[in-house]
Amino acid sequence: MGQSLTTPLSLTLDHWKDVRDRARDQSVEIKKGPLRRSGTVAPASGGAGAPGLAAPVEAMTEYKLVVVGARGVGKSALTIQLIQNHFVDEYDPTIEDSYRKQVVIDGETCLLDILDTAGQEEYSAMRDQYMRTGEGFLCVFAINNTKSFEDIHQYREQIKRVKDSDDVPMVLVGNKCDLAAHTVESRQAQDLARSYGIPYIETSAKTRPGVEDAFYTLVREIRQHKLRKLNPPDESGPGCMSCKCVLS
């Protein structure tokens, strides 16, 4: 406890940057096999049965995820917790960081390409660019910060504008659920998510509950979005209505 009072700020920031860099390095070291993006299968090298060649590596689907939210809500901490199973509580404002992690979700081997974005208002002009490339979005607020919850509407509207669509895969994430003090109640967040037609998940980047669930749920939302585009509902039929399951 005494150490936290005497450790120079420069050292804590250096520690944060070291952990972040190691998480980046770890993501870069992922074995580079064939990828399929947006449902397109990449060709495997070496045909089946070719003499002296190993069997082709199964193609992975790449998902481009973007983490958005106000400054200080724990976007970087969530991402590093997923990538490296490590929590860093020193705050070092992010401009833009990219991470990659290979995972298996519902039996499918996936490569998550995660963009951790700036929450500071002075970088708002950069948002359009990374929103164009993202397939799905984690919209993060802190449950002890009412303003960050109110800001979610702004991020969602910007995403819809940039993507020129009302149907964009998103997950609402209430971070810092390990804290005793809540200024945003679970029911408020659930009601907001329900009005948007998206899942809501509470997370703690510090103690890890909900972290994998948040990212994996977003991947599932992207999959469902692709299926809807391939098989659009027949809106001419009687009683047809669009709906989306909301997790709470």
From Swiss-Prot:
Alphabetically ordered keywords of this record: GTP-binding, Host cell membrane, Host membrane, Hydrolase, Lipoprotein, Membrane, Methylation, Nucleotide-binding, Oncogene, Palmitate, Prenylation
Modified residues (Cysteine methyl ester): 245
Database matches in SMART domains: RAB (SM00175), RAS (SM00173), RHO (SM00174)
Annotated region (Disordered), positions in chain: 28-48
Compartment annotation: Host cell membrane
Membrane topology: Lipid-anchor
Principal EC category: hydrolase
Residues anchoring lipid (S-palmitoyl cysteine): 240, 243
Native species: Rasheed rat sarcoma virus
Molecular-function GO term, any one: GTP binding
Protein name as annotated: Transforming protein p29
